[in-house]
């Protein structure tokens, strides 16, 4: 990590800890990143590392009093640089459980968060549907309250960790009240999982069908009709960590291309001494350093108050993922045919960079939100 983004000693120690985990992941990274399923060795390494504890408050087995976005960013930057499957699995453990952390009942928290911290169970956030992607208000899954119970019906699509998760946080429309969130254990009768269309994503995906799923009303997370609140808080904390993962991926691509440009001789000199190549690498370094600075500043703000500073998490995610795509593309260009060798580090970077501009807020949707915020602030 660049010295332009100074970290407190505790975060430096965490980074060193993660580097030891990364060393264990490196030998299996190519295999894990090429799989669309859950890689058991990656899960075992993460469980043993204790890193999942960063996703849960100390009261339920976590490492710190609250989930710390800066710590999550430190981990994701390092993991993504080596194994995107590990990065995804780590991030999803927090994304799927954070609604319980901040809005769950004491009983929900006690039942599930210690298992999240240990990695005994995986978590999943079930938002998207065949007709509802970025526009969550178009969700059609229904929640009908019947006395002391609630019945869920609907279909969720492209759900990360589907089929492996121990529970799902499901967003559903509760009549005229609006969207509510519910905690649905994976073994609940009426919940079934089917494989999704295979995507260029290094983690398990599936479609979740809820057919006459009956739960106690105590399965609701937070207040009725206010299910978007914990979801938005989840985005506020974890969106900035996508930026950190993008920075980590861009840094690795830059390192690979720079090593190649130093040693590859053409026209009697190393590529690095050819003006056009030098310019590509210089621009890439500027992209990496500037987005890293923005990312960690946004993470610090998210640590103070995630919802109050959501626009900065969004800015960081937009800037870093777009920059990552530019950097990786330049680095492949610098490396020529060697950057296209299947399963080489640069070719994997090329595959892994593209989805980051779509998940956890497509760039276009984020731009729209940022523009609205800007318009509201400028009189």
Functional labels for PLM-detected ranges:
Residues 131-142:
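Active-site-adjacent elements of ketosynthase-type condensing enzymes
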Residues 66-67, 135-137, 161-165:
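Short glycine/proline-enriched turns and hinge-like loops at secondary-structure junctions
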Residues 212-230:
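Long, acidic (Asp/Glu-rich), low-complexity accessory segments flanking structured domains
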Residues 84-107, 133:
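N-terminal glycine-rich flavin-associated loop
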Residues 1-81, 106, 115, 119, ...:
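Alpha-helical interface subdomain recognition
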Residues 187-216:
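Flexible, small-/acidic-enriched active-site or ligand-binding loops
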Residues 119-127:
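A short, Trp-centered hydrophobic/proline-enriched beta-strand micro-motif
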Residues 149, 155-192:
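A short core secondary-structure module
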């Amino acid at each position: 990590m660049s010295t332009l983004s100074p970290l407190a000693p505790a975060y430096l120690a965490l980074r060193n800890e993660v580097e030891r985990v990364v060393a264990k992941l490196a030998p299996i990274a190519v295999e894990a990143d090429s799989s669309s399923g859950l890689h058991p060795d990656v899960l075992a390494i993460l469980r043993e590392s204790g890193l999942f504890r960063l996703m849960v408050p100390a009261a339920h087995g976590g490492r710190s009093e609250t989930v710390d976005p800066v710590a999550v960013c430190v981990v994701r930057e390092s993991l993504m640089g080596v194994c995107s499957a590990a990065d995804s699995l780590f991030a999803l453990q927090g994304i799927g459980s954070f609604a319980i952390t901040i809005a769950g009942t004491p009983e929900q928290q006690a039942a599930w968060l210690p298992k999240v911290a240990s990695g005994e169970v995986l978590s999943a956030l079930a938002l998207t549907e065949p007709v509802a992607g970025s526009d969550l208000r178009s969700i059609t899954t229904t929640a009908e309250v019947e006395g002391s119970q609630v019945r869920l019906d609907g279909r969720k699509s492209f759900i990360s960790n589907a089929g492996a998760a121990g529970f799902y946080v499901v967003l559903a429309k509760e009549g005229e009240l609006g969207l509510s969130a519910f905690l649905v254990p994976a073994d609940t009768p009426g919940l079934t999982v089917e494989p999704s269309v295979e995507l260029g994503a290094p983690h398990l995906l599936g479609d979740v069908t809820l057919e006459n799923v009956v739960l106690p009303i105590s399965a609701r997370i937070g207040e009725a009709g206010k299910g978007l609140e914990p979801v938005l808080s989840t985005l506020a904390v974890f969106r900035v960590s996508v930026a950190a993962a993008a920075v980590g991926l861009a840094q690795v691509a830059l390192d690979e291309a720079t090593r190649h440009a130093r040693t590859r001789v053409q026209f009697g000199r190393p590529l690095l001494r050819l003006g056009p190549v030098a310019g590509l690498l210089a621009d890439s370094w500027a992209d990496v350093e500037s987005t890293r600075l923005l990312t960690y500043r946004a993470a610090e703000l998210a640590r103070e108050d995630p919802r109050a500073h959501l626009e900065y998490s969004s800015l960081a995610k937009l800037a870093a993922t777009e920059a990552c795509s530019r950097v990786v593309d330049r680095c492949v260009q610098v490396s020529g045919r060697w950057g296209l060798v299947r399963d080489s580090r640069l070719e994997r970077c090329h595959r892994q960079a593209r989805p980051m501009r779509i998940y956890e807020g497509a760039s276009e949707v984020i731009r729209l939100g940022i523009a609205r915020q800007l318009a509201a602030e400028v009189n």
